[in-house]
Amino acid sequence: MTNGMIRIIGLDPGLRRTGWGVIEAQGTRLTYVACGTILPPENAPMAERLAELHRGLAEVLARHAPDEAAVEETFVNMNPSSTLKLGQARGVVMLAPAQAGLSVAEYAPLLVKKTVVGAGRAEKAQIRMMIGVLLPKATPQTEDAADALAVAVTHAHHRGPAALRRAAL
């Protein structure tokens, strides 16, 4: 982008639903571009679901041409099988923008919540409400899309050499 403007895609990885949100940042000014949710077929074999997730992300990346990507880190839950499946989806979510030539930064959920809401233990409803305040034209239809916009906002606030170096490791 020109004039110091950068287009950022935020991604909230999931095997059932992956949220994406695109914003433009110029200095401290943030502008909503688009958001949505990719829904791989739930009853399809794992490889097919991952392939559909990749296809959907590649389409979004081609349509919105972001300059940088940011992905929310995932947490390990009590069910090892669920954690492994989420890890596979997260791998695809990180791969697609990297294949498109983008740097991919990662942010912990706690930092995303603290950046957007001001509290690391914020609820989903608080995140969605603050996204409406920060990006008045945004109309995320799912929590996943709202979370993805929150990841993009976090990247806009925390990006820079350190975040991009972490992404390159």
UniProtKB/Swiss-Prot annotation:
Record localization: Cytoplasm
Chief subcellular location: cytoplasm
Enzyme Commission number(s) from the entry: 3.1.21.10
GO CC entries: cytoplasm; Holliday junction resolvase complex
Annotated binding of Mg(2+) 2, by residue: 72
Positions of the catalytic residues: 12, 72, 144
Disulfide bonding pattern of the chain: none
Highest taxon of source: Bacteria
Family annotation (InterPro entries): RNaseH-like_sf (IPR012337), RNaseH_sf (IPR036397), X-over_junc_endoDNase_Mg_BS (IPR020563), X-over_junc_endoDNase_RuvC (IPR002176)
Family membership noted in the UniProt record: Belongs to the RuvC family.
Alphabetical list of NCBIfam families matching this protein: ruvC (TIGR00228)
Alphabetized HAMAP family for the sequence: RuvC
UniProt name for this protein: Crossover junction endodeoxyribonuclease RuvC
Organism listed in the record: Azorhizobium caulinodans (strain ATCC 43989 / DSM 5975 / JCM 20966 / LMG 6465 / NBRC 14845 / NCIMB 13405 / ORS 571)
UniProt gene name: ruvC
